A protein has these predicted regions:
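Canonical positions in the second alpha-helix
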Residues: 482, 515-516, 549-550, 583-584, ...
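Catalytic domains that recognize anionic headgroups
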Residues: 2-514, 518-539, 545, 556-559, ...
Length: 763
């Protein structure tokens, strides 16, 4: 239960100064006589400030954003906290730095419930709250949905098997805006807070027409086309509010989470370096009481939350670390220091993290070889002045230490946490290594400078792209090349193992995972992957040892407990599997998944009443849980409740249309009930869903034979026998063929099939 919001922060004298922004002035209170009624927060992913017309880019086609900039506040020097989506949005929503909220990367990090979000503050004040996101990295499972009455994420990971990485799982901005407009139109009487996240500027750059054709066929042109398309979606939102009369009473905030390097300093996208192309962001605010103004002062992403709340007449909760920017709206000065960081090089590759501070002109980057830039004279950050201005370097280094000391929270040193089993299972198909970091990468020791490692980083990125494009041998070669240059990258061995596994080279994959463990014998990801590879090879005892070792290192790791329980079921030890499941349930780990696994183990133990109870509890936790209804169907069949079994299998197919086992079991029940034509339909569905399902093909052959389709019966009987059906079912194929040949008058062939059936070993 989240603790009650604490409205204890007093907005300082700067808020009183906000009175001069609007006319007429008011004499009483900190806030304008009529504050905005609603808040529309639009976060534009991966948008560099210098790619908008309002920020001086001549090639931009961003009329709606430029018009918004002219009508309100345009902050010319805004800096993000991290050039990654989830950490930046966690700061946007809480007004705190990553060192406080603990979210420092995408995947494996979670915004814990203890942190108070903008949505929670506004919901407590009576606002309708709706969040609409365009990327899986902002899915609710990462904690970012706190406080939203309606949160549109709903990413089906099974549809993204060809995605290059986790951050490639996205949806078009038009779909996000459609959902937001539907929600906005459903209720007009209650004040609203809508957060609309548009991911389109993020790579891959695949803008829809007519935008794509308006720009050169280059990487830069494709990026600009995405921004133009995003601008049009922003326009749709503003037009809808204008049409129903609510725009005039709405505070509109547009901000980016981070920028894009576009090849500068050797980085193609973002996340690795913290140079200006990745950290300088657009920030616009327009609405009642805000006079148009270009603000040159340094501001930060963490300042958005307290500023928006101040404009709405609401005090910011403790411990917001950002500042209200209302003094700047009046034309006063604020001497703010921006702080940025990237732990991505360290968490993923074992190289040094990067941290920086800047005051609007001078920027200091703490790295193994420190960097100092005069942004006024050297906007491209190409002239490192660290050796030329030691006094300024020392002053900014001290400022960095002070900021980090003041903003650090208990979560800062935790590092990534395990991803839930369901997500991990699906992300593994993307070659994504997440939620597990080498112990060595968390230790404080001298590390490689990312400036020297950008070539290796790009090589590993290209390896991932090659894998997605089906060039798996090329991806393996690239990882091996990277390891030849730097054999200490534990995550590279993990990637190599994943690629080798994808190439169906399990022994080499096992060797790669073992090498990762040689580098770090407590690397949970390597332990887990090695155990899983053993399990896939049928080396169940070796797999059990690996999972037990991983469990001892992290007893709450849901994916380890899940695989261990599943392994014990495979070994025919349902009682031991149930003990693991009950341990997970006692720890409140992924309850719906483990209730399902408990039900499965109880079915194996023929405890059907207990299994029914467990499976129903799993569905209460997650109504759309795959295989839960299938297992209930098994229970009801055993209990002789055929109507309920039929309903359960039908329900499984509605939830998961690819559930071939549910179709098969449903067909068998219908066949036994004399509903041959319906049974035939579901037998066909089962073998269409699983083309090598030999047992299902033999049942289909028998159903077709009973219906008089001799040609179909012969074809499917032969196919079923070729696809290695269950031994107990294999004789059926020969008997179907014998029956077909008898009906055709081919007695010798019929006798041959009967003899073949009798020669089969008993099933």
């Amino acid at each position: 239960m989240k603790r009650a919001l604490l409205a204890v922060v007093v907005i300082g004298a700067g808020l009183a100064a906000w009175a001069a922004v609007a006319r007429p002035r008011w004499a009483h209170g900190l806030f304008p006589p009529k504050a905005p009624r609603n808040l529309l927060l639009i976060s534009l992913d991966t948008l560099r400030a210098d790619r908008l017309g309002s920020y001086g880019y001549a090639q931009a086609q961003t009329p709606r954003l430029d018009a918004l900039a002219r009508s309100g506040l345009r902050f010319e020097t805004a800096t993000t906290v991290v050039p990654l989506t989830l950490p930046a949005h966690s700061s946007l929503m809480t007004g705190t730095f990553p060192a406080w909220h603990g979210v420092r990367d995408n995947g494996g990090f979670y915004l814990d419930d203890e942190h108070i979000t903008l949505a929670e503050v506004l919901r407590e004040k009576g606002y309708r709250t709706g969040g609409f996101v365009g990327a899986f990295v902002l899915d609710r499972r990462w904690g970012i949905a706190q406080g939203f009455d309606r949160f549109f994420d709903d990413f089906d990971l099974d549809k993204f098997a060809d995605a290059a990485s986790m951050d490639s799982i996205q949806r078009p901005g038009a779909q996000v805006v459609d959902q937001a407009l539907t929600w906005l139109g459903a209720e007009r009487r209650v004040p609203f807070f809508a957060w609309v996240h548009l991911y389109d500027p993020h790579a891959p750059y695949e803008a829809p027409e007519p935008f794509r054709s308006r720009f050169p066929r280059t990487v830069q042109g494709a990026y600009d086309a995405e921004i133009a398309a995003t601008d049009a979606e922003v326009g749709r939102l503003l037009d809808a509010l204008q049409a129903d009369g609510r725009l005039a009473e709405t505070l509109v905030v547009v901000v980016s989470d981070h920028g894009e390097m576009l090849g500068e300093h050797g980085e193609q996208t973002h996340g690795f370096f913290i140079y200006e192309p990745a950290t300088r962001i657009p920030m616009l605010m327009a609405g009642p009481g805000l006079a148009p103004r270009a603000v040159p002062d340094q501001v930060r992403l963490v300042d958005v939350m307290p500023t928006a709340l101040a404009l709405l007449g609401i005090e910011a909760p403790k411990p917001v670390q950002g500042m209200s920017l209302l003094p700047l709206a009046r034309g006063e000065r604020m001497d703010l220091i921006a702080h940025s960081e990237s732990w991505y090089p360290r968490y993923h590759y074992g190289w040094s993290e990067l941290r920086s501070v800047q005051d609007g002109r001078f920027k200091y980057v703490r790295a193994p070889r420190p960097e100092l830039y005069d942004l006024e004279r050297d906007a491209s950050e190409s002239q490192n002045r660290a050796g030329d201005d030691p006094a300024r370097l020392e002053a900014l280094a001290q400022a960095l230490d002070e900021i980090e000391a003041k903003t650090k929270g208990a979560a800062a040193a935790e590092g990534p946490r395990p991803v839930d089993p369901e997500t991990e299972e699906r992300l593994a198909a993307l070659g994504y290594v997440g939620g597990s970091v080498s112990r060595q990468n968390l230790e404080d020791r001298p590390r490689g400078d990312p400036k020297d490692k950008i070539g290796l980083y790009n090589l590993l990125k290209l390896a991932g792209t090659a894998s997605v494009e089906g060039r798996i041998d090329d991806s393996i070669a690239k990882v091996r090349q990277a390891l030849a240059e730097d054999p200490e990258i534990v995550e590279a061995y993990m990637l190599l193992g994943n690629f080798l596994k994808k190439a169906k080279r399990p022994d080499e994959a096992i060797a790669a995972y073992r090498t990762a463990l040689d580098k770090d014998d407590e690397h949970q990801g390597a332990l887990f992957s090695l155990a899983l590879a053993y399990k896939d090879k049928g080396l169940l005892e070796e797999a059990r040892v690996g999972f037990e070792r991983a469990r001892s290192l992290d007893p709450k790791n849901g994916k380890v407990l899940w695989q261990l329980a599943d392994l014990l079921m495979q070994k025919g030890e349902p009682e031991k599997a149930e003990a693991v499941v009950r341990d997970a349930l006692a720890r409140k780990v992924d309850e719906h998944r483990f209730l399902l696994k408990l039900g499965e183990s109880q079915i194996e133990a023929k405890q059907f009443d207990a299994a029914e109870k467990s499976l129903r509890a799993a569905l209460e936790k997650k109504p759309n849980l795959d295989t839960a209804r299938f297992n209930l169907g098994l229970v009801y069949e055993e209990k002789g409740r055929i109507d309920r079994a039929i309903a359960s299998y039908e329900g499984e197919l509605l939830q998961n249309p690819k559930a071939f086992r549910a179709a098969f079991n449903l067909a068998k029940i219908l066949q036994k009930s004399g509903r041959r034509e319906e049974a035939t339909v579901y037998f066909k569905k089962a073998v269409e869903l699983q083309p090598d399902f030999g047992t299902g093909q033999l049942y289909l052959a028998k159903a077709l034979l009973d219906g008089g389709d001799l040609a179909g019966a012969e074809r499917w009987a032969r196919s079923g026998l070729a696809n290695k059906p269950e031994p107990r079912v294999a004789p059926l194929g020969h008997y179907v063929l014998a029956d077909v040949y008898n009906r055709k008058g081919r007695a010798a062939d019929a006798n041959r099939e009967v003899a073949a059936a009798k020669r089969l070993p008993p099933g």
